[in-house]
Amino acid sequence: MPHYILKKSFYEQSSLTVAGKLLGKKLLFNQHQGIITETEAYIGQDDPAAHSARGYTKRTSVMFGSPGFSYVYFIYGMYYCLNVVTEQEGFPAAVLIRGIVLLSENKPNTIINGPGKLCKILQITKEHNNTDITQKYNFCICNTDINIDNYICTPRIGISKGKEKFWRFVIPDLTFLLNV
């Protein structure tokens, strides 16, 4: 199967569908690449853990925008987090990329767990917010030959509200990815 950049139509699906289907896909950012191993969905204004729960603001405007765009924000005064906008324009939803297996030459097969670590190592910052990742080859997510059948859903991590939702998607055994 050729590896192609995921198109806007991929991100127009429900956030829960996208969060599961992103597992095993390849995140490309400048000279870095990694296989996505963990995601979390944040859906609409009724999701108390979503930034969009407080409505439309300058910060959340990207979440209300076109699917397939990056939503990068700063937390705890020290970390950036990378999300991809999902569903339909006007409905605020995004999927947080929480972990990857790094495939870059200088750190091959390194497990990066945590969205802050991911952005720090890949050097993703606020300047990469609101980028169309369906068009740029140096910042995109591509299809792979990896088929992820066995993932688990758990409660989301690091939130104080909406903990009852099992909207975190994770590959429990990364052993097979360490030889990709």
From Swiss-Prot:
GO molecular function: alkylbase DNA N-glycosylase activity; DNA binding
Pfam family, one: Pur_DNA_glyco
Entry annotated with the keyword DNA damage: yes
CDD domains the UniProt entry points to: AAG
Keyword hit for Chloroplast: no
Family per record: Belongs to the DNA glycosylase MPG family.
Xref: HAMAP family: 3MGH (MF_00527)
Annotated protein name in UniProt: Putative 3-methyladenine DNA glycosylase
Native source organism of the sequence: Ehrlichia chaffeensis (strain ATCC CRL-10679 / Arkansas)
